[in-house]
Regions:
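Interfacial helix-cap and linker-helix signal at transmembrane-aqueous boundaries
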Residues: 24-32, 111-112, 143-144, 232-240
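A late C-terminal transmembrane helix in Major Facilitator Superfamily
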Residues: 200-240, 247-248
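Helix-loop junctions on the cytosolic side of multi-pass membrane transporters
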Residues: 51-66, 262-271
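Helix-loop-helix hairpin linking two adjacent transmembrane segments in secondary transporters
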Residues: 9-56, 60, 124
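Juxtamembrane intracellular "pre-TM" segments in multi-pass secondary transporters
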Residues: 57-90
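C-terminal transmembrane helical hairpin of 12-TM major facilitator-type secondary transporters
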Residues: 151-198
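Helix-to-loop junctions at the C-terminal end of transmembrane segments
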Residues: 136-151
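Pair of pore-lining "gating" transmembrane helices in MFS-fold secondary transporters
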Residues: 82-100, 186, 190
Length: 272
């Protein structure tokens, strides 16, 4: 399973951004206004663009690259969409992102408007959860040396589902108390570090000859599902956590369903 470890470690380094970003945003608001946050985002985006253009070499060997432009991409994408294992793991990641984006979109309203936390306290809470996701990704990278990724994903998906249901119960019957909300947030967010990297690695194994197309489709599925979650969580306004909890439960359950389907189409010798 060593081939999967680098992707998990890369995911962990990516999760580091989620830990630092809210703290940076809180510091910017202390000395400036919300407009300065967007200037900071623009500056970092420009740095990323320049780094991509001039510092990061193409990692795919020349002999494995495909010519033909968008038409070739569509052909390769169609081929991958007929591979059930690729689609299943792509959807596992996509609906895990659906649940995660529900948290990202609505947690500030829940924590600040409903629980009464300050913006700085919320930023610290968000950073703690993101640090948990980063730590989970790095732990997963080590575990994959001896444990099959499906076993790791199975546990992580179960934890996310239980935490989402705990949040739903807290929203329905306990008026969204902090003693339920904060732990539920942590155990919804942190295990994602064990899901995204492993899910992407399992999907990529089904797209070895179309590595670029497979990566693009994984990113597209992730971004599209995340964009669907964002407007749903605000349906009841800023004083109800119920839409967020329902969205998180739905995302976690569909993700588990896709994971189960992936297991049914996995050769018995490769099952965890």
């Amino acid at each position: 399973h060593d081939r999967r470890s680098p992707r998990a470690r890369f995911g962990g380094s990516h999760d580091y951004e989620y830990s630092v970003a809210p703290l940076m945003g809180g510091l910017i608001l202390v000395v400036g206004q919300w407009r300065e946050i967007f200037w900071a985002i623009a500056a970092m985006s420009l740095i990323s663009l320049l780094g991509t253009l001039f510092l990061i070499p193409e990692s795919l060997p020349q002999e494995r690259r495909h010519a033909g432009g968008f038409r070739t991409f569509l052909h390769n994408a169609g081929t991958l969409l007929r591979r059930r294992l690729f689609v299943a793991y792509m959807l596992v990641n996509a609906f895990s992102a659906f649940a995660l984006m529900a948290y990202v979109s609505a947690s500030s309203f829940v924590v600040q408007e409903m629980l009464g936390f300050t913006s700085t306290q919320y930023s610290v809470s968000f950073a703690i959860n993101s640090t948990g996701m980063m730590a989970a990704a790095f732990l997963s990278a080590r575990l994959t040396r001896t444990i099959h990724p499906r076993r790791i994903m199975r546990v992580a998906l179960a934890v996310v589902s239980l935490a989402s249901f705990a949040l739903l119960i807290g929203s329905l019957f306990f008026d969204t108390p902090a003693w339920i909300v904060l732990p539920a947030f942590f155990f919804t967010v942190a295990p994602q570090g064990m899901i995204f990297g492993n899910g992407a690695a399992m999907a990529s194994e089904q797209a070895r000859e179309f590595a670029g197309t497979g990566s693009a489709m994984l990113g597209l599925g992730f971004s599209f599902s995340a964009s669907l979650a964002a407007p749903l969580v605000g349906i009841a306004g800023t004083h109800s956590s119920l839409p967020m909890a329902i969205t998180m439960v739905v995302g976690s359950l569909i993700s588990i369903g896709c994971f189960v389907l992936a297991g049914r189409h996995t050769p018995s010798a490769q099952r965890a």
